[in-house]
């Protein structure tokens, strides 16, 4: 897989690429601000420089969100709908922002996954066993993702392209920008799955050096939370639940694919597995567990 930023379509900025980060109302920070006005939403515009050996994002300006009227006459007091055009004559641009700070870009797609079997129409925000809006920046160039297929045809979808994001996506978004991706799709029949893919029931990321398992507050929220799951998931998620799910998945992974006892698996998790917060902004919160392949260099390849 390859991922590349797209150049700006505005001829005034030919050859340049830009992205935006919205510190929005659904962000983890929103109700815990220090300075006035509180609450507030802030958009920061970044220029993406891909001209050198190391590619960077650098802030150009930011502005506080003020009510915006869309082309249909609807007033948006908050960032409640994607793609609302911003009238720059009524916002105050601050060009003195993040001076001399350059962020290495990590282009990736926040949404990649297949369709679940539990519902015909599914909210695209919460991720689950089928993948979806996982927002893991490690799913970039050269990565391999495995998803359990739940419906005929799989119905793979992709979107939510990011130039850079940290673990947690804390303020609600990454640097959102247009990307061009190249993908290869391979169907693995369930009865042929062995090694690290045996019995896979969740999204698994494989890189050259690591396996990354994905845990969620609810491993299958559509089944676990009942008829109102797509509403209830936003109020019932927690980091504790997501960590518990990631722990359980990694325990089984080590016991079944590496032949460890439960006691061995638990010890290894504590000393050799990195658990991290994938995201806390997508309804079904995520914890990832990273284990390096080099730990098993003395074992037969699986």
Residue locations for each model-derived region?
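Short beta-strand elements
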Residues: 1, 185-187, 289-291
């Amino acid at each position: 897989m390859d991922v590349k930023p797209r150049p700006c379509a505005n001829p005034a900025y030919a050859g340049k690429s830009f992205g935006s980060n919205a510190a929005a109302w659904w962000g983890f920070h929103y109700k815990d601000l220090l300075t006035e006005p509180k609450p507030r939403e802030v958009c920061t515009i970044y220029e993406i420089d891909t001209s050198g050996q190391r590619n960077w994002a650098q802030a150009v300006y930011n502005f506080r969100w003020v009510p915006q009227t869309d082309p249909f006459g609807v007033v948006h007091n908050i960032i409640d709908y994607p793609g609302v055009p911003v009238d720059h004559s009524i916002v105050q641009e601050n060009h003195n922002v993040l001076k001399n700070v350059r962020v290495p870009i990590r282009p990736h797609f926040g949404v990649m996954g297949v369709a679940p079997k539990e519902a015909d129409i599914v909210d695209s925000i919460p991720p689950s066993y089928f993948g979806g809006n996982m927002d893991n920046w490690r799913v970039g160039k050269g990565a391999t993702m495995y998803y359990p297929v739940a419906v005929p045809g799989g119905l793979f979808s992709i979107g939510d392209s990011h130039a850079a994001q940290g673990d947690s996506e804390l303020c609600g978004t990454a640097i959102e920008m247009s990307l061009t991706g190249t993908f290869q799709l391979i169907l693995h029949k369930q009865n042929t799955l062995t090694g690290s893919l045996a019995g896979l029931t969740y999204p698994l990321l494989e890189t050259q050096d690591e396996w990354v398992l994905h845990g969620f507050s609810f491993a299958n929220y559509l089944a676990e939370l009942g008829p109102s799951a797509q509403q209830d998931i936003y109020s019932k998620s927690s980091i504790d639940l997501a960590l518990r799910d990631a722990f359980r998945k990694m325990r089984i992974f080590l016991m079944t694919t590496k032949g460890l006892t439960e006691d061995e698996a638990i010890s290894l998790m504590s000393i050799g597995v990195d658990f991290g917060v994938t995201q806390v902004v997508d309804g079904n919160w995520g914890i990832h567990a990273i284990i390096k392949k080099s730990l098993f260099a003395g074992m037969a390849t699986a």
